[in-house]
Curated annotation (Swiss-Prot):
It holds the Pfam family CBP4. One of its GO terms (biological process) is mitochondrial respiratory chain complex III assembly. Residues 106-139 form a coiled coil. It comes from Vanderwaltozyma polyspora (strain ATCC 22028 / DSM 70294 / BCRC 21397 / CBS 2163 / NBRC 10782 / NRRL Y-8283 / UCD 57-17) (Kluyveromyces polysporus). The gene is CBP4. It comes from the Eukaryota. Belongs to the CBP4 family. This is Assembly factor CBP4. It is found in: Mitochondrion inner membrane. It is a single-pass membrane protein.
Length: 144
């Protein structure tokens, strides 16, 4: 005999609750705390973490100041002010990158031109030497 519809839905909700509850319990008891995670790091990484903690705290305080000034202003939230939006292209960085690549290309081009000029000078010098040798060894006034 088939069970009533409400019993089947009760089973569905009970199984769903067990799945969600077991997931939450697993997450709670298997995820390490911050102290456990730091203690499990190697000594070098732990030292690096400790030295950079003050820097991260200063960054966080600076961010909170910016957030407070942004919250006090009458401008819309999408005008981020001193904070650069991740969706806006950072034109300054792009320009610096282009200038760096252009300067590097100019240096490479100058070096290539110097190398070519040096090779050309060597070829001209060899050509002049060969011409002088031919002129010195050949008598131009003899017909035979």
């Amino acid at each position: 005999m088939e069970s009533p519809l409400w019993v089947r839905w009760l089973k569905v909700y009970a199984v769903g609750g067990v799945i969600i509850g077991s997931g939450a319990l697993l997450f709670k008891y298997t995820t390490p705390t911050d102290e456990q995670l730091i203690a499990s790091l190697s000594p070098e990484l732990r030292l690096q973490y400790e030295t950079e903690r003050k820097l991260r705290q200063a960054e966080q305080q600076e961010l909170m100041k910016i957030v407070q000034t942004t919250a006090e202003s009458d401008q819309p939230i999408w005008k981020t002010g001193p904070i650069k939006s991740p969706w806006e292209k950072d034109t300054e960085t792009v320009q610096q990158k282009e200038m760096f690549q252009k300067a590097r290309a100019d240096v490479a081009q100058r070096e290539e031109l110097q190398r070519i000029r040096k090779e050309l000078a060597e070829i001209r010098q060899k050509s002049e030497q060969k011409t002088q040798e031919i002129v010195n060894t050949k008598s131009w006034w003899k017909f035979w």
